[in-house]
Amino acid sequence: MQEFKIEGEYIQLIQLLKALNWVEHGAMAQWVVAEGCVKYNGQVDYRKRLKLRPGDVVEFDGMQIKLV
């Protein structure tokens, strides 16, 4: 599992998807979250502005990342 270091207290889910280049743009990030394509700590989550903190794990399209 790869790790991603965040700056500050948290990063929003759609910002993380864009920062990792898992999606091409913000609209696509919002769409994949709304369609239930993203897992947060092992469960599908539909919150686009979900605040991710160190220790959280995000999965999308066979990729997995842990925030540190």
Per-segment meaning from a language model:
Residues 1-11:
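A detector for short, charged/polar N-terminal pre-domain segments
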